[in-house]
Amino acid sequence: MTLGQTAALPMTAVTAWELLFERMSIPAAAHATHGSMLVINAAGGVGSILVQLAQWAGLDVIAVASRVNWPWLQKYGIHKLADYHSDLTPQVQALGYDMVDYIATLYDPVPYFGAIADLIAPMGHVGSIVATDDSLPVAWLKNKSVSLDWEYVFSKSDYAYQMATQGQILQRLSALLDAGALRSTIAYNFHGINARNLRQAQAMLETKNTIGKITLQAPFDGEAKALDDIVWKDPQSYADETLVAFPSRRPDDGDRRAGTDSGQRHLVHPTGRPSDRGKDRQH
């Protein structure tokens, strides 16, 4: 792999590994388990590697992302797809799953928590890497005896807890990459580390529309690349080794997250069942 492809992985891959194999207690071995997993925000940096690890471990993966980003996920072998613009519950059920064993929410869980409560199987695991300023109605999970698992990649270093395990995880990931079981998640590469490219990369992140990972590659230089050197590659044409950079303007179909565009945030259980979950709530 190139330096950029390698640099795209460590933080997101360790996050995904810890969520799956430590927090959710899924066996960390090839085809070691079975069952199903719903991944919300599957085309992002963590999602793009997490779906690969979940498949490697033996899980059936259902990926939630904007339709424009489905080709990105399909190149990783993910073919069960749902669009976050529409209600998730009927989409997942249409794929043949009344409930799933695991749900990984890699974006603010608030807009999705009703669907999560409906779709998670009894004794299942719901994992999140994203905090929210709103209260989550976790009591909705109680009657199914569902575990809610949080993952934060800096927990170990912040509290000096089993820090050596992250180096061991990187060694496992390196072996899987060398064996071809995993692929890099780089989607955008800026050639040259300079103020303009840093501003462009930051602007990309602030749109919350990116897929995969962004890298900036040496050399360090003081001059920006010309606009013509920054090209958007349509998702349909992604190739394994293609490095694409951010366009001077955003694509028409941005990856806006459901329930957040207008600032309205809803916590409503789809079935309206009040038992142990309280009344429908709006924030």
Where are these predicted regions, by residue range?
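Mid-domain Rossmann-like dinucleotide-binding core that forms the NAD(H)/NADP(H) cofactor-binding site
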Residues: 7-86, 236-243, 247-283
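Short amphipathic alpha-helix with an adjacent loop that forms part of the alpha/beta core around
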Residues: 87-98
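N-terminal Rossmann-like NAD(P) cofactor-binding module of classical short-chain dehydrogenase/reductase
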Residues: 101-104, 244
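Helix-to-beta-strand junctions that scaffold the AdoMet/dcAdoMet cofactor pocket
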Residues: 120-121
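Short glycine-centered segments of the SAM/dcSAM-binding site in methyltransferase folds
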Residues: 124-125, 147
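C-terminal substrate-binding/catalytic core of Rossmann-like NAD(P)-dependent dehydrogenases/reductases
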Residues: 140-189, 279-282
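C-terminal capping/lid region of NAD(P)-dependent oxidoreductase domains
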Residues: 175, 181-188, 199-244
